[in-house]
């Protein structure tokens, strides 16, 4: 009997392999070249183009165990995860597919045979649904399989429109579609619920375990259903559901995978009650988060990365709720790999990266989690009614990194509704503000619409004749311009590269007899290329022929920087890991800027390795080869694509030896040796999960190295040595400085002790207690604590308040001897004073410190101390 999830997966794939199906690996959770999908959410996703007739495989039968994620976008189960028996962010879909091979009878027979003979499920526990008018399916189930008529349930259009039914599948408004048949399992009458199609169908007694889709129509825009020439089959069975049945449990969270993960999470956090819903949330979320990172998604503030961030933060919040006091989530990865078996092969290969990324995100969120939860808790405690306003939800999102669904999760536990509409309004207002700021000083050309087309000749030439097809001035089409006029000139063909893919637009001239138009920038306007600039001499009109001449030096320097970004991208992936992907770039003649996904700062040793690797590839002088090919062929060759971009069916591929292959429309050097030298000038984080490297190449890199050498020699001269001795001499100077600082601190302690003897005489007695309140001039804040300790020793039973004002800041300290903390607490005392000087602070009952920003109020604040103490000592 197949019991474990791993055994069920193997049994399913082996059953269909033995029945002529090609076992195909699970595709990535990031759908390839399909921007309509946020994540892979069904087994058929990777075969979409096959079903549409746009792709052909060397097999007509396939079977998979597909990893899927449903969180964010149309298919979003996140809010329900942990609170129901069957909702998950991550699940595995077992499926078998026919591409114009077998159809209804074979598909139905395969499903029934696997369930009743391989898994030996009792037939009397199974019932099936079919589409209302699918008599063919009824005959197969009833006459050929032997399912009783009363156990075959017809489902009509139950979603308010023709063919809108639980039993009619559609890829979209048009395209392949058809009826489907679902197999249900009866958990028994001890669980509430009715058969599908009944008023009680939403109960948990009858659970759908397998959906068999018969793609037999091609839906037209008119709504007409035309028969497909080669009908196909798409099926799906959630492995978690069938595992629950085979393991004799009702909830998916009770199967082997989840039992293991829940137990491990409880052990790490220190929880004994394994029924906690928060443990379910954590166990579910580690699966989606770990596999998403393994497939190249990194936490960020946009797109797929933001969905990942939301899931991680929801898990961390539930861990916090259970009492977790340190990073715990990443520690579940080894257990996940172990329990997922063969399905975790890719995850095992990227385990170190996955753990680091999870830990970094968890630690980052932990810095704001407690404070954010405190603000949310206070808002909920003060709430009048049952709805939390959108402004508060937005503040938590904007300031403390709380995704709205995390706030909603907390509110749900207290039966509070979230004002989602108000949150969206606040979000829209922020977007408007950001857009307004971004548009400040925007050029009128940004909104220019040009209905023309320009051919690009700049891959092979930097000059050539062209005809002026349009001229735009101040956003309006004109027929001619005169000397001194600024304009956008459109040509029928141009060697000028228009800004795209991070590469800046070319500069140069358009010249003719007595005419010179200086091109300061080149931009794309739809299919047209616009040459932005000013007419230096002569008159220029539409229809005129000009010589288009690109500035060769600037283009050459830009090409050096563009080509090296490809080498840099490949080197980063080799040194840091294959999770690295390009997030943006800027390539101009002076420098390059490359943004990439990574969860932590790049170490100096790693940067050095990256730089050396790039320079090695430069010295190898690879020839740069470009080729036009189909997108699928390019991806099969391993071409890197910008994450989530939509590409045309034909793409341009740039290859540099066996080191780099990318999709790119930019201009490049002929050989990597042309780059000369690559030098990184800076590396920094620009957003959560996004790093930026700035660098220079060629002559600019040589100049940078020369400047560094000059500065090194200048430093050596200041240290009275040479370049080779700078480090040793600097270390000696730092050691000497530390010793001087130590001696200075000792001297300050002695001075404080001497000063304390003078200050003792300033103490007054209040109800038998020594009270010393003093504003000190010329005393550094770092000396206050030592001085307070000395005064306590001398005064024995005492209350002390000292304050200094330096450089626009106030520093305060309060000390209370142990015999008096029952009446006066140092934390309360110093907080009272700090509030009057624009500050805050606190500490222990016997000693507390504070700061402030209003030194002009210090005298008045200290004057309030004696009455405050007197009142408490009365």
UniProtKB/Swiss-Prot annotation:
GO terms for cellular component: cytosol. GO terms for biological process: alanyl-tRNA aminoacylation; negative regulation of DNA-templated transcription. GO terms for molecular function: alanine-tRNA ligase activity; aminoacyl-tRNA deacylase activity; ATP binding; tRNA binding; zinc ion binding. Signal peptide: none annotated. Its main location: cytoplasm. Zn(2+) binds at residues 562, 566, 664, 668. The keyword Transmembrane helix does not apply. It comes from the Bacteria. It comes from Shewanella baltica (strain OS195). InterPro entries: aa-tRNA-synth_II/BPL/LPL, Ala-tRNA-lgiase_IIc, Ala-tRNA-ligase_IIc_anticod-bd, Ala-tRNA-synth_IIc_core, Ala-tRNA-synth_IIc_N, Ala-tRNA_ligase, Ala_tRNA_ligase_euk/bac, DHHA1_dom. This is Alanine--tRNA ligase.
